[in-house]
């Protein structure tokens, strides 16, 4: 019974994607990386600052649109003209800020986690990129010291076929191996840096 339950549980955890859909493949691999990075490391606490900022900007834009609609309903045009003009400008300004935030701050980041210890705090980020009509999945794992701002990163650029089988099943163990390799490389650099500073 135990083996059957284990097999059924493994079957339920399998993620299958259309391997010809680049966007679906990227999101599935991102989810697998995030699960491995955060699920196996209790010392990493997930942070939602980037997501919350995006949600706040979207909420403000929607609020401006609702306010404009409500004002125009209670104060028909042309009385509502100044408010509508302000709302349109504010709406597109917020969308512009949201675009800049996504392009220059997020940069494909899908996981952010904070690691606290006695000496300092470190911020881990996982980001990815997969260009259209390209099978290469670029995964970047970075760590930044929140005190001195020093940032280090490790990258992996492999075909998505290295992590997905012929049936479109995401091979979590192979994803985990790659994530662990990048994480351990950064952790080793961190230990070397701390030992050098102590000497």
UniProtKB/Swiss-Prot annotation:
Keywords: Endoplasmic reticulum, Membrane, Transmembrane, Transmembrane helix. One of its GO terms (biological process) is signal peptide processing. InterPro entries: Spc2/SPCS2. The chain crosses the membrane at residues 50-72, 82-104. Its main location: endoplasmic reticulum. GO terms for cellular component: endomembrane system; signal peptidase complex. It is found in: Endoplasmic reticulum membrane. Residues 73-81 are lumenal. Residues 1-49, 105-199 are cytoplasmic. It is a multi-pass membrane protein. It comes from the Eukaryota. PANTHER family: MICROSOMAL SIGNAL PEPTIDASE 25 KDA SUBUNIT, SIGNAL PEPTIDASE COMPLEX SUBUNIT 2. Component of the signal peptidase complex (SPC) composed of a catalytic subunit twr/SEC11 and three accessory subunits Spase12/SPCS1, Spase25/SPCS2 and Spase22-23/SPCS3. The complex induces a local thinning of the ER membrane which is used to measure the length of the signal peptide (SP) h-region of protein substrates. This ensures the selectivity of the complex towards h-regions shorter than 18-20 amino acids. Belongs to the SPCS2 family. Component of the signal peptidase complex (SPC) which catalyzes the cleavage of N-terminal signal sequences from nascent proteins as they are translocated into the lumen of the endoplasmic reticulum. Enhances the enzymatic activity of SPC and facilitates the interactions between different components of the translocation site. This is Signal peptidase complex subunit 2. It comes from Drosophila melanogaster (Fruit fly). The gene is Spase25.
């Amino acid at each position: 019974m135990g083996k059957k339950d284990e097999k059924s549980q493994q079957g339920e955890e399998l993620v299958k994607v259309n391997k010809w859909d680049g966007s679906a493949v990227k999101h599935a691999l991102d989810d697998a990386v995030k699960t491995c990075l955060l699920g196996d490391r209790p010392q990493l606490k997930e942070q939602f600052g980037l997501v919350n900022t995006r949600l706040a900007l979207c909420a403000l834009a929607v609020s401006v649109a609702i306010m404009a609609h409500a004002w125009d309903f209670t104060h028909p045009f042309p009385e509502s003209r100044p408010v509508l003009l302000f709302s349109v400008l504010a709406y597109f300004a917020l969308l512009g800020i949201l675009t800049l935030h996504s392009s220059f701050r997020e940069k494909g980041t899908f996981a952010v986690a904070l690691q606290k210890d006695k000496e300092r705090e470190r911020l881990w980020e996982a980001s990815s990129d997969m260009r259209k009509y390209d099978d290469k999945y670029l995964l970047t794992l970075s760590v930044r010291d929140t005190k001195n701002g020093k940032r280090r990163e490790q990258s992996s650029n492999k075909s998505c076929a290295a992590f997905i089988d012929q049936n479109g099943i995401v091979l979590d163990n192979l994803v985990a191996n790659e994530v662990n390799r990048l994480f351990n490389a950064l952790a080793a650099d961190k230990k070397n840096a701390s030992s050098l500073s102590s000497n």
